[in-house]
């Protein structure tokens, strides 16, 4: 769970500290055939890099191979990018709320793919996904009040 929280939280904290510096959107502003951007301007290379760095450090602190932390972060960010892609295709605004779609892909994908490496059971994976959903639901409004998140979700 700490790997997930570190990978997911790193881009948010990095944005808080760096503001608008080094912001390079992953989709480079490209649009899909529906006229909407592929992912949106909030999905940046800076965010992916910060997730990888923080999750690999967290893995090291947890006694897990840093390479597992790198893969965990990359899979977490891939899940987040897939969710953003789906939200754009559904016509949802950038950074809009979409319960489940906002949390399930980025928690399920790394846990599922790294199940063996992290010695997770299917029950563990289900609990990780559920717990991450609940943390996002209840902690995000607090982080918004503290001006760490830009939205209360």
Specify the residue positions occupied by each region the protein language model found.
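Interhelical loop and helix-boundary elements at the membrane-water interface
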Residues: 1-66, 70, 77-112, 122-153
């Amino acid at each position: 769970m700490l790997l997930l929280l570190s990978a997911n939280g790193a881009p948010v904290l990095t944005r808080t500290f760096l503001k608008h510096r080094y912001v390079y959107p992953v989709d480079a502003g490209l649009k899909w055939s529906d006229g909407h951007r592929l992912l949106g301007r909030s999905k940046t290379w800076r965010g992916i890099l910060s997730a990888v760095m923080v999750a690999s450090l967290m893995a090291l602190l947890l006694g897990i191979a840093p390479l597992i932390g790198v893969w965990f972060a990359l899979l977490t960010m891939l899940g987040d990018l897939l969710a953003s892609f789906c939200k754009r295709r559904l016509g949802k605004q950038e950074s809009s709320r979409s319960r489940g779609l906002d949390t399930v892909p980025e928690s399920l994908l790394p846990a599922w793919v790294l199940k063996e490496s992290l010695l997770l059971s299917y029950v563990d994976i289900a609990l990780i996904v559920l717990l991450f959903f609940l943390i996002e639901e209840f902690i995000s409004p607090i982080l918004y009040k503290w001006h760490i998140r830009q939205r209360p979700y």
